[in-house]
């Protein structure tokens, strides 16, 4: 069994700092479990580890595709499992680090995913329908053809709704019937970092302000100038979509920043629903004075590291 340390938690809780510390101490490498960090040129809005941080600890599954390229959950699972196997084969400790619930669950629970190639024709038709009739119409249709999948997907997550309908239309089989679970070949410990909501929200707000100071607005502008449009999954994600009204003259910059803080709070509230399902969880308060020592002890006890 391959030893695998997962470090999970809501956005801005402190996963990066802890994972870097543990990776340096236990000769590890980090596999990102963040659906936004796979995109090149989207650095500030996705809170990627800095170049200096990535120079000290090898990172995987960051800067994998351009913002206009498709990147599926199945592809992530394939690449992440390959990276974990490679890290372990070289005698190092793999750390799976992030907050994207589907990515974490696919790897840690061993999801057997439908290998249905993208169908641009079907997807384009569904995207047109979403644009003309709203995401609610697509969600209502999904509830008809695949109520199990609909129950797992938030009504506002149009991208996942479209993918579920795309798989159904391409195969005639609901996506929920094409997924099973096979326990993965890992000896897993999951460290779940937590914070009281008011403390976490304050951290989120401070990070948004730091992102703005670091040039987030210019990053978004640069992506638009490169030709990446708002309807791309990358550009419609958290940290970027909030600026669309500003660039289209429908909102002030202050309103866009306020919306980004609000949306990030909402996202952080929803993330724990995924974390609760993960295997072998140890919960640690992210603001504990002895956090590093407690995390180190967990790694030593679990993986017999020294």
From Swiss-Prot:
Task: Read off the lineage from the record.
Answer: Bacteria, Bacillati, Chloroflexota, Chloroflexia, Chloroflexales
Please give the InterPro entries that the UniProt record associates with this protein. Answer: Dimethylallyltransferase (IPR039657), IPT (IPR018022), P-loop_NTPase (IPR027417)
Asked if Calcium is a keyword of the record, the answer is: no
One MF term in GO for this entry? tRNA dimethylallyltransferase activity
* Catalysed conversion reaction: adenosine(37) in tRNA + dimethylallyl diphosphate = N(6)-dimethylallyladenosine(37) in tRNA + diphosphate
Q: Which gene specifies this protein's sequence?
A: miaA
Family per record? Belongs to the IPP transferase family.
Q: What class of enzyme is it?
A: transferase
Output this protein's name. Answer: tRNA dimethylallyltransferase
Q: Where does substrate bind?
A: 11-16
Give the organism the record lists.
Roseiflexus castenholzii (strain DSM 13941 / HLO8)
